[in-house]
Amino acid sequence: SDVIARGRRFLGEKTFFLTGLDEHGQKVQQAAERDGRSAQAYCDELAAQWQSFAARLDLINDDFVRTTDERHKEVVRAVLNKLHDQGDLYKKGYKGFYSVKEETFLTDKDRNPDGTWASQWGEVVELLEENWYFKMGQHQQWLVDLIEANPSFVQPDYRRNEVLGFLKSETLEDLCITRPASRLSWGIPLPFDPEFVTYVWFDALTNYITVPAALGDPVVNNALKGYYHPASGIGNPASELWPADIHVIGKDIIKFHAVYWPIMLKAMGLPLPKQILAHGWWQKDGAKMSKSTGNVVDPIAVIDEWGVDAFRFYVVRELAIGPDGNWTDGGFQARYQSELANGLGNLINRSLNMLKKYRNGVVPARANDLEPDATKAVADFVAALKANELQDALVAIWSLVGRANQFVDQTRPFTLAKDPAKAAELDAVLYNLVESCRILAVLLTPFLPSSSVKILAQLGFEQTGSTVWDAKWGNLPAGHVVGEPLPLFPRKDQPKS
């Protein structure tokens, strides 16, 4: 999500990156009880830990919404009141089996062939209770038509087909949106029936419109008119945030986002997000990560040893959006050595060192030998970024890294430097290399932001907000003086196993 947001800013698009935490529900209440603390204190500590972790990852989200925030509760109450007044909610009794782990009612379709419950559901109990329901079933055909008419709405395509398969093969039942407060106290009480609290997913999904509503987004606030009043007022152009361009989610929660959420928005009178992009899970050495078996990756430990940009690089380079990714320590170390240290880092270091050694760090006149390669790399990079094909964007960058390193081997500037008659040739080689390094630094902005700034600083530029317009060949002026070359990705000749 951070790379996509940075990428959109890089392309010059107005961008607002929202993330946060859903904190209500039975699992949280039980975890807090086991910990001997209030649910709020428990959530406060986890939220602080998460935000600290986000900072270590170099994330630049514009806002962070917690479902325990009062601003969020106000929006949830407004939505519930509106749907209640419209007749979209009703109360009825229900007897069924309930997964405590997943906080959802189950049906016989969720059983194993032998009639038992799959381990994914955890503890399953039989409940007989009254709850409030949202009239979701009446929207089934509308949602099928919408997804079929808009192929890009759910991506990748096979996730879209999964959603359509579900909608076409099963009758969409009305959604239970409450839990009795006598059983679950940790939730947002229904404003019109305080004996119930809001179902965690109905509450959590609403967080997408919490910040737009609070900032005065006219679309959201017009839909909730009479039910919600933003403190900041309506009409500030900076508040025009809805509909969202993209929701980036995990594959395990696609049903909530591609089925429940669109229907909720339709009932509210709100437009839908333009795209729901579902990514896979990380495996470790080909197996599901598990704390109990020790088969996990500690991101902080990786960042401490290898640097945040090395971690960001491998995560994006190795995980295509859609299928599961497979983390291996050997794979991480191999990519670090070959692509970061020996590829990118070596190119930057030797290009600048040669310019310092042979021309006192002064950029010679423009030369264009590598311009076609750089122009193609930029075009491929931009196309991939627009399509959210982040792996392909990195491939485009490293195509220029490889070509520039090849150019050094072909032109042999260290040999040219020995012959005064070849000074013009050496000048051309040096310009091509240093300008390629500058363009690479610009393109790295969304992916390796810290390294991008470091490279630009070594090139003698104090630049932190690079955009696609900076990636034009020839923007490096003759006579410019570069800074001091420093190792970007120190080689680790004996990586730890």
Protein language model regions, located:
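N-terminal, positively charged nucleic-acid-binding surface of large information/translation enzymes
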Residues: 1-155
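Structured secondary-structure scaffolds
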Residues: 1-19, 71-78, 119-357, 393-397
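Basic, alpha-helical terminal appendages of large translation-related enzymes
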Residues: 16, 37, 92-97, 111, ...
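A glycine-rich phosphate-binding loop feature that marks nucleotide/adenosyl-phosphate handling sites
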Residues: 24, 96-102, 280-282, 331-332, ...
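N-terminal alpha-helical segment
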Residues: 24, 295, 373-378, 436
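Hydrophobic packing residues in well-ordered alpha-helices of helical domains and bundles
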Residues: 43, 76, 337, 367, ...
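Structural signal for well-ordered, non-membrane alpha-helices
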Residues: 51-54, 80, 84, 345, ...
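Active-site-proximal binding-pocket segments
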Residues: 254, 318, 322, 331, ...
